[in-house]
Amino acid sequence: MSYPETKMVRQTLTGSDSGASIKVNSTSTGVEIHTHDASFNQSLFDELHLWAYNSDSSARTLTLQWGGTTSPDNLIVISIAAGSFLKVVDGIHISGNLDVKAVASAANVVMIYGYALSYVKEHPNKESDYASDESVYYNGYTQR
């Protein structure tokens, strides 16, 4: 069985405005960090790389809701020291249009930074540029 060639496309987190930090402004309802978009290049999965900055003078807990809110299945709980910047996710995958959300033990003091590497199928006719009903193929990648 042959598998289609895949490529990585680096993307801004969907919860970020132009790559800026995402402020975790909630202690109960998850703030969107990233949502996997299976329609983007028939994306197989996204690999996330996330850092957190705690601007408070006290240690804070960051909880990442990874595709759901069931404990412990979908929760990643991290303690972040006061005034520290810490890598909190190093290449964990998400797929199937699931999302990653965050809550913190105090609102408006923890910021999330990062990016997603989307693993996508390369279009077989990568040398041509053409349009279809739903997608435009450019240099082998579907652009929306």
Regions found by a protein language model. Name each.
Residues 78-85:
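Short proline/glycine- and polar residue-rich coil/turn motifs
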Residues 1-43, 104-144:
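C-terminal interaction-tip segments
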Residues 40-49, 93-95:
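Short, solvent-exposed loop/turn segments enriched in Ser/Thr/Gly
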Residues 46-48, 58-62, 108-112:
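Short beta-strand/loop motifs in extracellular/secreted proteins, especially
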Residues 85-91:
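Exposed aromatic-hydrophobic patches
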Residues 55-77:
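Short, surface-exposed beta-strand/strand-loop-strand elements in extracellular ectodomains
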Residues 92-109:
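Noncatalytic modules at the cell exterior or secretory-pathway interfaces
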Residues 48-53, 100-102:
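Buried hydrophobic-core signal for structured, non-transmembrane domains
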